[in-house]
A protein has these predicted regions:
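Conserved, helical-rich catalytic subdomain that frames metal- and/or nucleotide-binding sites
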Residues: 144, 149-243, 258-264, 268-275, ...
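Short beta-strand scaffold segments in enzyme catalytic cores
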Residues: 19, 44-47, 138-142, 148-149, ...
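Short, basic/glycine-rich phosphate-binding loops at helix/coil junctions
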Residues: 51-63, 111, 205-216
């Protein structure tokens, strides 16, 4: 078999169909209960064999540095496999930053999957997820993708059946939200929103989109500081969204639609006020090599 010199990986962004803060763990981290959904909006990551470790972010205003999740993933991979090598990483970002859509986690997952393929390491999904968990809480989900019930700090994942057919319109305001600041605000003021993730899991298993949406919610929404959330939700609902909510710690907000036409009409309306608007469907996978 010929040696691979270059690999391209696609890694889906994620949405939180539900996010509840259950409490605090002994570690001090928040105990979460969530439903995560991969969507057809992808980070594209190209990895090439190299004697050095390099990272490029074409078109990004963020300068590459050792705190980048992609670099952390590469270093974790080399440490775990004891490979004496390098890799050249180019990330073509499509997911907005500080949006609550796990773009950085998707990048890390893409690097782990790509390097596993590039260097023929044959690491299992469980090994990749264990490495990913050391990099970021959402990296294991970015590796698995699809639809998952996620608990703890992101370390307990249960794969669920695909959600019923639907479309998502995602709107990102002109600012981002800091995840630590959002959780700090939650600790100060709490939330009246506590979605029933168990009911949502049952709805997904039953293929019931209405019940899925009825159980949707985000406990961080009221305290995220994202001032456009209410206006975005109202616009999406006016254009037929079954439900609308913030994803993750924000600042992106999305609506769930039954059909593509309504989702795209909502997107066109949103673009009159907000620049970053996306239309996507559920994705049944996670980070994977693009053939």
């Amino acid at each position: 078999m010929a040696r691979l010199n270059c690999v391209t990986v696609l890694a889906p962004a994620k949405l939180n169909l539900a996010l509840d803060v259950v409490g605090l763990l002994p570690s001090g981290y928040h105990d979460l209960d969530m439903t995560m959904q991969a969507i057809t909006l992808y980070e594209r990551v190209v990895l090439r064999r190299s004697p050095y470790l390099n990272l490029r972010l074409p078109g990004s205003l963020v300068a590459p540095n050792n705190k980048n999740t992609a670099i952390k993933a590469a270093l974790a991979f080399f440490d775990y496999t004891s490979l004496l090598a390098g890799v050249d990483i180019t990330i073509y970002k499509n997911t907005p930053v500080r949006a609550g859509m796990a773009g950085g986690s998707a990048d890390a997952a893409a690097v782990l999957v790509g390097m596993n393929e590039l260097y023929g390491a044959h690491l299992s999904m469980s090994e990749l997820c264990a490495l990913g968990a050391k990099i970021g809480a959402d990296v294991p989900f970015a590796l698995m993708g699809g639809t998952c019930r996620v608990q703890g700090v992101g370390d307990f994942l249960k794969a669920l059946p695909p959600v019923p057919e639907c479309w998502f319109t995602v709107v990102m305001p002109d600012y981002g939200v800091s995840t630590p600041e959002a959780f700090a605000a939650y600790d100060r003021v709490g939330s009246s929103i506590h979605p029933d993730c168990g009911a949502q899991e049952a709805a997904i298993r039953a293929g019931d989109l209405d019940a899925l949406c009825a159980a949707a919610g985000n406990a961080l929404e009221e305290c995220s500081g994202a001032t456009d959330t209410g206006a975005i939700k109202a616009l999406l609902r006016e254009h037929g969204a079954v439900t609308a909510l913030m994803t993750g710690s924000g600042a992106a907000v999305f609506g769930v639609f039954r059909d593509e036409g309504a989702a795209r009409a909502a997107a066109q309306a949103a673009k009159r006020r907000w620049k970053q608007v996306y239309v996507a469907q559920p994705d049944r996978g996670g980070a994977r090599v693009s053939r």
